[in-house]
From Swiss-Prot:
Produces ATP from ADP in the presence of a proton gradient across the membrane. The alpha chain is a regulatory subunit. Its EC number is 7.1.2.2. NCBIfam families: atpA (TIGR00962), PRK13343.1 (NF009884). It is a peripheral membrane protein. One of its GO terms (biological process) is proton motive force-driven ATP synthesis. It catalyses: ATP + H2O + 4 H(+)(in) = ADP + phosphate + 5 H(+)(out). It comes from Shewanella oneidensis (strain ATCC 700550 / JCM 31522 / CIP 106686 / LMG 19005 / NCIMB 14063 / MR-1). This is ATP synthase subunit alpha. GO terms for cellular component: plasma membrane; proton-transporting ATP synthase complex. PANTHER family: ATP SYNTHASE SUBUNIT ALPHA, MITOCHONDRIAL.
Length: 513
C-alpha cells in the first residue's frame, strides 16, 4: 500500500496530537547515615509517616521518624550494601500486603511473599498493614463460641468469636501447643486461621507447619513468619501483616482466628528500632508508645455487625456478621506478670489464660491455673451444654486447691472435707489432655457430666484417664445419635440429661475400675 506525502504528513500530525507525556513526580533524597538497619535520609520533603521508601535493588524502608532536616527510616531486609550518598525515592504508598483465599495453606514472610517453595500466590488484592479498628457502632457483642478443644479452657475460660484472649506464661509451659491445638480444632468449624510467628527459630516454625499439615489444618491456615534472624523491622511488622490477612475474612462476613506467637518478641524488636532511632526510652527501656503498639493491633480483633459487612462488600454479602478472634501470646520471666509488657497486654485483652511452670512440671498439662485465669466476655458465647455442666468444675478446683493447702497442716479431716479433696483431685486429673488431641463438644460434655454427677468417685486416680478414654469410646459406639446431636446443636435438656445418665449408668455397671 502506497502512501502519498499528504497522508504521511496527516498521520504524523495525528500521532503527535495523540502522544501523551506521562511524567512521574517523585521526591528523591540522599542517604546521609547507615547503622544497624536504620538509615537517615536528607532531602525528602513530603514523606508520610509509615510511607514506603524505595531503595536500590527492589528493597524498601519505612519512614518512622520525621525530623526537621532528615528522615529516620528502618530497612526491611539486608542493608550491608547501603552507604552514604545513595539516592532513594518516596513511593506515596503505605506498606500493603497481599490478602485473599489464595494465601490459605501457604507460609509467607512479613511482606506476604511465599517462602514455602510452592510457587506464586494467587491473591485477591492488597490491604494496608495499618488499618483503623472498627468503631463502637460497627461492632456486635460476642455470643458465638470458639472451641479450642481443651476441656480446661472451654469449660472454665470460654472464648467467643471476636474476643482477645491472652495466653501468658514462662517459656516451656505449653503456650504455643495450646494455640496450635486451637487451630487444629478449627479444621471443620469454618473458622479460617492465621498463625504469626515472631522471633522464633526457623526449625521451630518448620515443626509447627509440619504438625498443622499432619493434622489436616494447614489448608485452613495462613502462616506468617518473621524468624529471629530477620531484621527487627520485619519482626515488628509481622503481626500487623497477619492481622490484615485475617481482616480479609472478617470484613466479608466470615470468622477468623489469629495467633500472635509472641508479642513479647515483637515489643523487643520495636524497642530495638526505637532506641536506634534515638527515641527517648521509658520503663524497661521500652519507648513511650509501646502500649499503643499492642492496643492498635489487638483492637482490630472484633466481631462486626451485618451493616458493616454489607457496607464493606457493597451489598454483595448481606445478613452476616464477621469476626476476628485473637490469641496473643506473652512470655513472662520467672512468672512475673507485673512486668511492663505483660501488664499492658493484660489490660488490653478480654481475659487471660495463665500457664504455670510448677503445674507443667507436676504433669498437669495443659498447665492452666484456673484461679487466676479468666474470660471476661466468653461466658455469653459458651456452648449451652458446656455452660450448664461446667459450673461446678471451677468451684471444685478452687476449693480443692484451698483444702489441699490446708490439709498439709491438719492431720484429722472430716468426711465432707475428704470427699471434696477426693473429688477435686479426680477433676484435676480429668482436666489433663494430650497435645494434638483436641476434643469435640460432645466428648467434653460426656467427661464433664461424669465428673459433675459423681461417676469418678470409685475410680482409682491413676485410672481416670483410662476411664475417660473407655467411656468416650463406649458413648461413640452405643450412643452415636446423642453424640451427633450434642455436636450439632450444643443443647442441654432433660431428655439429653436422661440419655447421658442412662449411658453412664450402663457403662459403669459393665466396667470395674
Amino acid at each position: 500500500m502506497q502512501l502519498n506525502s499528504t497522508e504521511i504528513s496527516d498521520l504524523i500530525k495525528q500521532r503527535i496530537e495523540q502522544f501523551e507525556v506521562v511524567s512521574e513526580s517523585r521526591n528523591e533524597g540522599t542517604i546521609v547515615a547507615v547503622s544497624d538497619g536504620i538509615i537517615r535520609i536528607h532531602g525528602l520533603a513530603d514523606v508520610m509517616q509509615g510511607e514506603m521508601i524505595e531503595l536500590p535493588g527492589s528493597r524498601f524502608a519505612i519512614a518512622l521518624n520525621l525530623e526537621r532536616d532528615s528522615v529516620g527510616a528502618v530497612v526491611m531486609g539486608p542493608y550491608a550494601d547501603l552507604a552514604e550518598g545513595v539516592k532513594v525515592k518516596t513511593t506515596g504508598r503505605i506498606l500493603e500486603v497481599p490478602v485473599g483465599r489464595g494465601l490459605l495453606g501457604r507460609v509467607v514472610n512479613t511482606l506476604g511473599e511465599p517462602i514455602d517453595g510452592k510457587g506464586a500466590i494467587d491473591n485477591d488484592g492488597f490491604s494496608p498493614v495499618e488499618v483503623i479498628a472498627p468503631g463502637v457502632i460497627e461492632r456486635k457483642s460476642v455470643d458465638q463460641p470458639v472451641q479450642t478443644g481443651y476441656k480446661a479452657v472451654d469449660a472454665m475460660i470460654p472464648i467467643g468469636r471476636g474476643q482477645r484472649e491472652l495466653i501468658i506464661g514462662d517459656r516451656q509451659t505449653g503456650k504455643t501447643a495450646m494455640a496450635i491445638d486451637a487451630i487444629i480444632n478449627q479444621r471443620d468449624s469454618g473458622i479460617k486461621c492465621v498463625y504469626v510467628a515472631v522471633g522464633q527459630k526457623a526449625s521451630t516454625i518448620a515443626n509447627v507447619v509440619r504438625k498443622l499439615e499432619e493434622h489436616g489444618a494447614l489448608a485452613n491456615t495462613i502462616v506468617v513468619v518473621a524468624t529471629a534472624s530477620e531484621a527487627a523491622a520485619l519482626q515488628y511488622l509481622a503481626p500487623y501483616s497477619g492481622c490484615a490477612m485475617g481482616e480479609y475474612f472478617r470484613d466479608r462476613g466470615e470468622d477468623a482466628l489469629i495467633v500472635y506467637d509472641d508479642l513479647s518478641k515483637q515489643a523487643v524488636a520495636y524497642r530495638q528500632i526505637s532506641l536506634l532511632l534515638k527515641r527517648p526510652p521509658g520503663r524497661e527501656a521500652y519507648p513511650g508508645d509501646v502500649f499503643y503498639l499492642h492496643s492498635r493491633l489487638l483492637e482490630r480483633a472484633s466481631r462486626v455487625n451485618e451493616e458493616y459487612v454489607e457496607k464493606f462488600t457493597k451489598g454483595a454479602v448481606t445478613g452476616k456478621t464477621g469476626s476476628l478472634t485473637a490469641l496473643p501470646i506473652i512470655e513472662t520471666q520467672a512468672g512475673d506478670v507485673s512486668a511492663f509488657v505483660p501488664t499492658n497486654v493484660i489490660s488490653i485483652t478480654d481475659g487471660q489464660i495463665f500457664l504455670e511452670t510448677d503445674l507443667f512440671n507436676s504433669g498437669l498439662r495443659p498447665a492452666v491455673n484456673p484461679g487466676i485465669s479468666v474470660s471476661r466476655v466468653g461466658g455469653a458465647a459458651q456452648t449451652k451444654i458446656i455452660k450448664k455442666l461446667s459450673g461446678g468444675i471451677r468451684t471444685a478446683l478452687a476449693q480443692y486447691r484451698e483444702l489441699a493447702a490446708f490439709s498439709q497442716f491438719a492431720s484429722d479431716l472430716d468426711d465432707a472435707t475428704r470427699a471434696q479433696l477426693e473429688h477435686g483431685v479426680r477433676v484435676t486429673e480429668l482436666m489433663k489432655q494430650k497435645q494434638y488431641a483436641p476434643m469435640s463438644v460432645a466428648a467434653q460434655a460426656v467427661s464433664i457430666f461424669a465428673a459433675e454427677k459423681g461417676y469418678l468417685k470409685g475410680v482409682e486416680l491413676k485410672k481416670v484417664g483410662d476411664f475417660e478414654a473407655a467411656l468416650l469410646s463406649y458413648m461413640n459406639s452405643e450412643h452415636a445419635a446423642l453424640i451427633k446431636l450434642i455436636n450439632e446443636t450444643g443443647d442441654y435438656n432433660a431428655d439429653i440429661e436422661a440419655e447421658l445418665k442412662a449411658g453412664l449408668d450402663k457403662f459403669v455397671a459393665t466396667q470395674t475400675w
